[in-house]
Amino acid sequence: RQYVAQALSDEAELSVAGQVVPLSVFCDTGFHLQEPLSGRAVVLVRLDAVSLPTELRAYLDACLAGVGAEPRPEWGVRFVPCQTVAGHCLLPALPAALGSNGRKQDGIYAAFCDMPPPPGGWTALVSAETAALLGK
């Protein structure tokens, strides 16, 4: 099976935790993360690429470092299982919306990872299904 990644738009915006964050979004046809309880779509966001409130950022950093931390209930944190060639992990995720090309997908989750900047400079990955809903 061949996987394809392509840039969607330099003007995508993620609404998360009361913030609107600009993203460089890539569509990866091999990307299939879903929030397990609701089955909702997930956008994978590089944590270092976005600006979030200090307390929330500290919580997400602790989660990704494997340090137990208690989230504030109003954040609505869920954990999304992720399987890669490097192994299995649980990524912290927050309720979000993603907009691009005049379209918006509400009711999704933004899962955060701590990976270094990849080639192409994307800050978020979406599935082909999410890309189609955004008009790509």
Where in the sequence are the language-model features?
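Canonical alpha-helical transmembrane segment with a positive-inside/aromatic-interface signature
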Residues: R1-P36, A41-L44, S51
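Aspartyl protease catalytic core from the pepsin/retropepsin fold
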Residues: E11-S15, Q19-T29, A62-G135
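Electropositive
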Residues: G39-G76
